Every structure is written in C-alpha cells, then in structure tokens.
Amino acid sequence: MDHAIWLPYCQMKTARPPEHVVRSEGVMLHLADGRQLIDGIASWWTACHGYNHPKIVDAICQQAREMSHVMLGGLIHQPATHLADRLSRMIPGHDNRVFFCDSGSVAVEVALKMASQHWINQEIVGKNRFVCFQNSYHGDTAGAMSICDPVDSMHSHFKGFLLEQFPTTIPKSEQEFKAFKDFLLERRDQVAGVIIEPLIQMAAGLRFHSVASLKGIANLCRELGFILILDEVATGFGRTGSMFAFEQANLKPDIVCVGKGLSGGSVGLAATIATQSVYRPFHTDSWDHALMHGPTYMGNPIACAAANASLDLFEKEPRLEQVQMLEMWLSGYLEPLKAHPRVVDVRCKGAVGAVQLEEDVPLQSAIDFFVDRGCWLRPLRDVIYVAPSFTIERPQIETLCSAIREYVDTQ
C-alpha cells in the first residue's frame, strides 16, 4: 500500500487497497477518482445526521475560532458543562454525573473503574470482576477486551494479560433466568457489576435479544445489588428506534456508556454517565476516593460543540420518526430474503438491517462487489448489514438492499 497508515481490523499485506475519500456529504462518499458511494454503515454507525450537516459544521467552526481545546483538569468550559447537563438529564435519576472521554472503548474502561472503585471506596473488598455475555463486544482496550466474548471475539491473542471475567449467555426462558440467578449468586462476592449491550450486540454480527431478557437481567441486578452497566456506545442516539435502547425496557441503569453518534459522527467523543448512587462513594473528603482517570482531550470544546449541535438536531428534526420509517423500508426490502436457501436469518430493528448467511462472507471480495455497485458496505463475518445515517432517502436504501440481494443470489 502506498501510504504509512496502519489500518484497523486489516491484514495489511493481503487487503484490497482502501478507497480514497476526498469529500463526504449527506450519505455519500466522494472518491478521488470521481466515483461516489452510498455509505450504508454511516462510518461504523456514527453519522446519524449524515455527513457534514451544516448545523454541526457551523458549531465546530465557531468553537474552533473561540477555543479549540483546554484541559478539564481544574478548568471547565461552557460547551462541556452544557453537554454534561443535557446528558445527565437524558438518563433516569437525579443529579447524574458525566465523565467525558474520546472513544467508546475508554467509556467502557471508565465504567469498569467506576463500578470497581464504588465498592473499594466503601471498604467492600473483592468485588472487582464483571459478568458479561456471549457474543459481546465492548472495545479494544484491555479492560474492554476482557469483557468481550472470550471465544468468538477478535482478542484471542491477548488472553494472557487480560483479566478473567464471568461470561455467560443472555437468558431467555424462565429456566434460563433461574440458572442465571444462581450464576450471579455463586459469584456475588466477586462481581462489581453486569455489563450488556442493550437489545443489539452490534459488532458481534448484529445479534438481537428481547426487551424481556434485558428487563429480567436488570431486575436481577437490582434484586441482588449489582451495578448495571449499559453499553449504549453503538445503540444510543436513535439507532434502535428510541433515543437509547434501554428506554424500550423502561430501565434505570446505574452506568451508561455513550459514544459514536454522540457528536453526530463528526469528532471523536464519548462519555460515561453514572447515577448519584454510583457517584456518592467517590464524593468524600478523602483523596483516595477520587476517580483517577483523565484522558488528555476529554471534553474537548470542539467535540462538545459538535455534540450539542447534534442533540439540537435530535430535538428539532424528526430523527426518531425517520428511524421508524427506515425500519419499515429495511424490513420491506430485506425480509423476503428469509426464503433464500443461503440465508439463515434476517433481522431488522430501528436503523439496522442484517442478513445472516450460512457461512462467513469473504470480506475483501464482498467489498469489491458492493463498491462496483456504488455502495459502501462492510460485512461482519457471516452478516451483511445496513446501518445508515437516519437522513438516508428511500431510493438510496433500495440501492443498498438491491446490492445485498444480488450478492446473495450470485455469490
């Protein structure tokens, strides 16, 4: 490759040359050679309003002229305080606290540290491990890797230095919930919290679980006194049809991790939001009780300005209604593929449509196939999926879904 970039999730020696993007607008990627691609995955599910939305661009430019960055160590600024207040009010509870960071993985790391230290600060020792779930993905930093699926994740090379956690399956039936409760009780003195991606495990191949399962897990956490951490990095900000996925189960989580769509897909930004009950043991006269974590660029003013503009758009534009329409379109175009002999399942929810095949999709040749048809799609193992910007129009959805149907028919 004729560049020095080490690309993510990529065997650099054998990978197809990356497409060179020179401009993005709406749902379109404009390439250096003049071609255009419909982006069907919104840059890993971030660009919820489409690329280069003028409201977000204006907010970024204005903030860059006033103050591009200042540390949050002993200093604060209006974009961060305004955003923190808004995020705090979006999560159930009174006086929630918002810790800013720069990626979803770090938001998860912070959540794990909050949950562990919550018990340490109360002199409750040994509660420093986490219950997580099969097929889960929470990020690529060390703590986040430790709570990903231990067998079927991308992190098998790193088992030697990862903390051992308590993975299990997401319960569905009454019998499975009884077994899950026993599982929790057996580890009660070791578990700091339970972490789950609500409703959709996105990076695991867009695997869905029910509102009933999510409610049942949350109820057991409440009953047994476990901290419930919801990883809404991928599912938050409208992706599943509600502002946050947990709203569909009417939950009151203890900690929520957000990212991706937080800034409307414009600037890297994430946050970990904790309830007052989690925060209280940190708020003492002891320095030892302070949370010792601080990303250099946490709460960057430009990123916070972008996020505030994005939240303004959610308030002023019919984004959730657009997501509901997207679900109808995706279901209409993709559900007929259930009858195809190569298709195992078709799943649609909110702004997500997934077609699961009998075997893994060869990534490089599949990307070639879709690029030749003017589409940017990037399959996940045995799943070809669409998770676009919420502003995408029906003809563009039809083009993406037609390309998927053609791929399933011909490959």
Show where each model-derived region lies.
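Conserved N-terminal phosphate-binding loop of PLP-dependent enzymes in the Aspartate aminotransferase
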Residues: 1-411
